[in-house]
UniProtKB/Swiss-Prot annotation:
Residues 8-127 form the ERCC4 domain. It comes from Saccharolobus solfataricus (strain ATCC 35092 / DSM 1617 / JCM 11322 / P2). Signal peptide: none annotated. Changing D52A: Loss of nuclease activity. This is 3'-flap repair endonuclease Xpf.
Length: 233
């Protein structure tokens, strides 16, 4: 059983990726524009120390990050690291932090987890990965081939866009609202796709797929290399 977790390059300095490796986890670094850790196609984690949590709320980064996290991933997670009681020591406006966490849960459907320290964070990430990569939740994904009858043009458009790698129903709707038509999505640049997708790698993958000529050779090679959508990350 090999657990793989994608980590943002900026997380190297935290030391958590090394702790994950000590737990037997394969860590793959990438430039993530949304989230700090990607567990599966649908699950991602934004890690914040207590200090960073407080600062991000007051400098307006918090809700932008949480909003993008919930738009890109079906199961977004905020992991708060450190003693939550320290918030009262850091700021007199601690109620604003509590309200932000409540809003993240209720308004953005973000799950909020807590860890004592970096070592505990690594343990929490491992447990999340075990649940979603190998546990009962592994099969809890939307299958593109088990949908109800498509009765409208909008349904068909969503169906087509959802077939792109790492694009679920929420992100498919976001792409269509941003670009208007499937043709415009196909004509978009990598930078334009990245802004909508929240990931440079995903944008490059979709851009390549849309512009690569179909051939039996490509199909055979891809079937040997790729076993799941997670491999496209």
């Amino acid at each position: 059983m090999v657990i793989r977790i994608y980590a943002d390059d900026r997380e190297k300095a935290s030391g958590i990726p090394e702790l994950l490796k000590e737990l037997g986890i394969t860590v793959i670094f990438s430039q993530l524009t949304v989230a700090d850790y990607v567990i599966t196609d649908d699950v991602a984690v934004e890690r914040k120390s207590v200090n960073d949590l407080v600062n991000s709320v007051f400098d307006k980064r918090f809700f932008d990050q949480i909003s993008r996290l919930s738009e890109v991933y079906r199961f977004p997670i905020l992991l708060v690291e450190g003693d939550i009681n320290d918030i009262r020591k850091i700021t007199e406006k601690w109620r604003a932090i509590n309200n932000a966490l409540i809003s993240a849960t209720i308004d953005y459907d973000v799950k909020v987890f807590y860890s004592r320290d970096k070592k505990d964070t690594a343990e929490v990430l491992k447990k999340i990965a075990e649940k979603f990569q190998f546990g009962e939740n592994k099969s809890n994904r939307i299958s593109l081939h088990n949908k109800a009858k498509l009765e409208s043009v909008s349904d068909i458009q969503l169906y087509i866009v959802e077939s792109f790698p790492n694009v679920g129903s929420i992100l498919a709707e976001r792409l269509l609202l941003k670009f208007g038509t499937i043709q415009n999505i196909c004509n978009a640049s990598i930078s334009e796709l990245e802004k909508a997708l929240g990931s440079r790698k995903k944008a490059e993958d979709i851009y390549k797929i849309l512009r690569t000529h179909y051939s039996k050779t490509n199909l055979d090679n891809d079937s040997k290399k790729t076993t799941s959508l997670f491999d496209f990350l």
